[in-house]
A protein has these predicted regions:
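Short coil/turn connectors at secondary-structure junctions
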Residues: 113-116, 163, 185-187
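Small-aliphatic-rich amphipathic alpha-helix that forms the alpha element of a beta-alpha
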Residues: 25, 44, 76, 117-129, ...
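Short helix/loop capping segments that flank catalytic or ligand/cofactor-binding pockets
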Residues: 87, 129-130
Length: 200
Protein backbone atom coordinates (compact mmCIF):
# COMPACT_ATOMS: atom_id res chain seq x y z
CA UNK A 1 0.00 0.00 0.00
CA UNK A 2 1.76 3.17 -1.22
CA UNK A 3 -1.13 5.61 -1.06
CA UNK A 4 -0.28 9.08 0.21
CA UNK A 5 -2.96 11.51 1.38
CA UNK A 6 -1.87 15.14 1.61
CA UNK A 7 -3.72 16.72 4.50
CA UNK A 8 -5.19 20.20 4.40
CA UNK A 9 -3.18 22.78 6.38
CA UNK A 10 -3.98 22.70 10.10
CA UNK A 11 -6.08 25.49 11.53
CA UNK A 12 -3.60 26.79 14.09
CA UNK A 13 -5.55 29.93 15.05
CA UNK A 14 -8.82 28.51 16.32
CA UNK A 15 -10.37 30.90 18.88
CA UNK A 16 -10.81 28.55 21.85
CA UNK A 17 -9.23 29.50 25.20
CA UNK A 18 -6.61 27.06 26.46
CA UNK A 19 -7.78 27.22 30.07
CA UNK A 20 -11.33 26.45 29.01
CA UNK A 21 -10.12 23.43 27.03
CA UNK A 22 -8.25 22.17 30.10
CA UNK A 23 -11.31 22.67 32.29
CA UNK A 24 -13.74 20.98 29.88
CA UNK A 25 -11.52 18.10 28.77
CA UNK A 26 -13.32 14.77 29.16
CA UNK A 27 -13.00 11.15 28.08
CA UNK A 28 -15.98 10.21 25.94
CA UNK A 29 -16.48 6.62 24.80
CA UNK A 30 -19.56 6.99 22.63
CA UNK A 31 -19.58 8.44 19.15
CA UNK A 32 -21.74 8.75 16.09
CA UNK A 33 -21.51 6.32 13.20
CA UNK A 34 -20.06 9.05 11.01
CA UNK A 35 -16.77 9.85 9.33
CA UNK A 36 -14.50 12.44 10.88
CA UNK A 37 -14.04 15.49 8.60
CA UNK A 38 -10.57 15.58 7.04
CA UNK A 39 -10.00 19.06 8.45
CA UNK A 40 -10.47 17.71 11.96
CA UNK A 41 -8.11 14.83 11.22
CA UNK A 42 -5.54 17.31 9.93
CA UNK A 43 -5.90 19.50 13.00
CA UNK A 44 -5.72 16.73 15.59
CA UNK A 45 -2.69 15.08 14.00
CA UNK A 46 -0.88 18.41 13.91
CA UNK A 47 -1.85 18.91 17.56
CA UNK A 48 -0.39 15.50 18.39
CA UNK A 49 3.05 15.97 16.84
CA UNK A 50 3.01 18.53 14.05
CA UNK A 51 6.15 20.46 13.17
CA UNK A 52 6.47 23.88 14.79
CA UNK A 53 10.14 24.50 13.98
CA UNK A 54 11.82 23.26 10.83
CA UNK A 55 15.07 21.32 11.04
CA UNK A 56 18.32 23.06 10.13
CA UNK A 57 21.83 21.80 9.48
CA UNK A 58 22.56 22.14 13.19
CA UNK A 59 19.28 21.35 14.92
CA UNK A 60 16.44 18.88 14.69
CA UNK A 61 12.89 19.96 14.05
CA UNK A 62 10.55 20.68 16.94
CA UNK A 63 7.09 19.23 17.44
CA UNK A 64 3.94 20.45 19.15
CA UNK A 65 4.56 17.91 21.91
CA UNK A 66 7.88 17.53 23.76
CA UNK A 67 9.96 14.37 23.80
CA UNK A 68 12.86 13.44 26.04
CA UNK A 69 16.11 14.79 24.56
CA UNK A 70 13.98 15.73 21.53
CA UNK A 71 14.25 12.08 20.48
CA UNK A 72 10.92 12.19 18.59
CA UNK A 73 10.67 8.43 18.98
CA UNK A 74 6.88 8.30 18.87
CA UNK A 75 5.08 7.92 15.54
CA UNK A 76 1.32 8.19 15.17
CA UNK A 77 -0.42 5.58 13.04
CA UNK A 78 -3.96 6.30 11.91
CA UNK A 79 -6.45 3.45 11.61
CA UNK A 80 -9.34 4.21 9.28
CA UNK A 81 -12.00 1.85 7.90
CA UNK A 82 -10.18 1.70 4.56
CA UNK A 83 -6.73 1.00 5.97
CA UNK A 84 -3.78 1.89 8.18
CA UNK A 85 -1.66 4.99 7.65
CA UNK A 86 1.38 6.57 9.28
CA UNK A 87 1.31 10.30 9.93
CA UNK A 88 4.29 11.99 8.27
CA UNK A 89 4.56 15.20 10.27
CA UNK A 90 7.26 16.67 8.03
CA UNK A 91 5.00 16.54 4.97
CA UNK A 92 1.76 16.75 6.99
CA UNK A 93 0.46 13.73 5.11
CA UNK A 94 -0.81 10.21 5.66
CA UNK A 95 1.36 7.44 4.23
CA UNK A 96 -0.41 4.18 3.47
CA UNK A 97 0.81 1.14 5.40
CA UNK A 98 -1.88 -1.55 5.12
CA UNK A 99 -5.06 -2.09 3.12
CA UNK A 100 -6.82 -3.49 6.15
CA UNK A 101 -9.25 -2.18 8.76
CA UNK A 102 -7.48 -2.47 12.13
CA UNK A 103 -10.02 -0.42 14.08
CA UNK A 104 -11.51 -3.49 15.82
CA UNK A 105 -7.99 -4.42 16.97
CA UNK A 106 -6.83 -1.20 18.62
CA UNK A 107 -8.69 -1.92 21.84
CA UNK A 108 -10.28 -4.84 23.64
CA UNK A 109 -13.57 -3.07 24.32
CA UNK A 110 -16.67 -3.74 22.20
CA UNK A 111 -17.00 -0.03 21.41
CA UNK A 112 -14.10 -0.39 18.96
CA UNK A 113 -16.40 -2.05 16.44
CA UNK A 114 -17.89 1.35 15.57
CA UNK A 115 -14.85 3.58 16.02
CA UNK A 116 -14.37 6.03 13.10
CA UNK A 117 -10.70 6.91 13.73
CA UNK A 118 -8.03 5.21 15.80
CA UNK A 119 -4.61 6.59 16.67
CA UNK A 120 -1.83 4.15 17.51
CA UNK A 121 1.21 5.54 19.31
CA UNK A 122 4.32 3.56 18.38
CA UNK A 123 7.79 4.05 19.86
CA UNK A 124 10.92 3.35 17.85
CA UNK A 125 13.58 2.48 20.40
CA UNK A 126 16.29 3.05 17.79
CA UNK A 127 15.67 6.80 18.09
CA UNK A 128 16.39 6.80 21.83
CA UNK A 129 20.12 7.23 21.30
CA UNK A 130 21.04 9.27 24.38
CA UNK A 131 23.13 7.20 26.84
CA UNK A 132 20.52 7.84 29.54
CA UNK A 133 18.23 5.39 27.72
CA UNK A 134 20.46 2.44 28.53
CA UNK A 135 17.81 -0.18 29.28
CA UNK A 136 14.33 -1.18 28.17
CA UNK A 137 12.70 0.07 31.36
CA UNK A 138 13.93 3.60 30.74
CA UNK A 139 13.04 3.39 27.07
CA UNK A 140 9.52 2.26 27.93
CA UNK A 141 8.88 4.87 30.64
CA UNK A 142 10.17 7.62 28.35
CA UNK A 143 8.05 6.42 25.46
CA UNK A 144 4.94 6.27 27.65
CA UNK A 145 5.49 9.82 28.89
CA UNK A 146 6.18 11.21 25.43
CA UNK A 147 3.11 9.52 23.96
CA UNK A 148 1.06 10.95 26.84
CA UNK A 149 2.04 14.50 25.89
CA UNK A 150 0.80 13.85 22.37
CA UNK A 151 -2.46 12.24 23.40
CA UNK A 152 -3.23 15.12 25.78
CA UNK A 153 -2.77 17.56 22.91
CA UNK A 154 -5.34 15.51 20.99
CA UNK A 155 -7.66 15.67 24.01
CA UNK A 156 -7.41 19.46 24.12
CA UNK A 157 -8.07 19.81 20.40
CA UNK A 158 -11.05 17.47 20.64
CA UNK A 159 -12.44 19.58 23.48
CA UNK A 160 -12.14 22.73 21.38
CA UNK A 161 -13.61 21.02 18.30
CA UNK A 162 -16.44 19.30 20.22
CA UNK A 163 -15.20 15.80 19.39
CA UNK A 164 -15.22 12.65 21.51
CA UNK A 165 -11.95 10.94 22.37
CA UNK A 166 -10.61 8.26 24.71
CA UNK A 167 -7.16 6.82 25.32
CA UNK A 168 -7.15 3.02 25.52
CA UNK A 169 -4.72 1.26 27.80
CA UNK A 170 -6.30 -2.19 27.41
CA UNK A 171 -4.62 -3.09 24.15
CA UNK A 172 -3.39 -6.40 22.76
CA UNK A 173 0.01 -4.88 22.03
CA UNK A 174 1.63 -8.05 20.74
CA UNK A 175 -1.29 -8.81 18.45
CA UNK A 176 -1.43 -5.26 17.13
CA UNK A 177 2.35 -5.23 16.68
CA UNK A 178 2.08 -8.31 14.48
CA UNK A 179 -0.88 -7.02 12.46
CA UNK A 180 0.92 -3.74 11.77
CA UNK A 181 4.10 -5.50 10.66
CA UNK A 182 6.30 -3.54 13.07
CA UNK A 183 9.97 -4.34 13.69
CA UNK A 184 11.36 -5.68 16.95
CA UNK A 185 12.60 -2.17 17.79
CA UNK A 186 9.10 -0.69 17.55
CA UNK A 187 6.66 -0.91 20.45
CA UNK A 188 2.94 -0.14 20.61
CA UNK A 189 2.49 2.21 23.59
CA UNK A 190 -1.29 2.69 23.58
CA UNK A 191 -4.12 3.83 21.35
CA UNK A 192 -6.68 6.62 21.17
CA UNK A 193 -10.09 6.83 19.52
CA UNK A 194 -11.66 9.97 18.05
CA UNK A 195 -15.15 10.57 16.68
CA UNK A 196 -18.18 12.82 16.71
CA UNK A 197 -19.94 12.64 20.09
CA UNK A 198 -23.47 11.28 20.26
CA UNK A 199 -24.56 14.28 22.32
CA UNK A 200 -23.42 16.95 19.85
Amino acid sequence: MTKIISLTPPQTNLPFPLMRAIKERRTKRKWQDAELPMQDLSNLLWAACGITYEATERTKSRRTAPSSCNSQEISVYVALPEGLYRYDETEHALVGVLDKNLLPNIGTQSMMQSAPVGLIYVSDYRKLTNPVFNNDDRRWYTSAADAAFMSENVYLYCTAAKLATAVLGLVDREGLHKLMGLSEHEKVVYTQVVGKPVDS
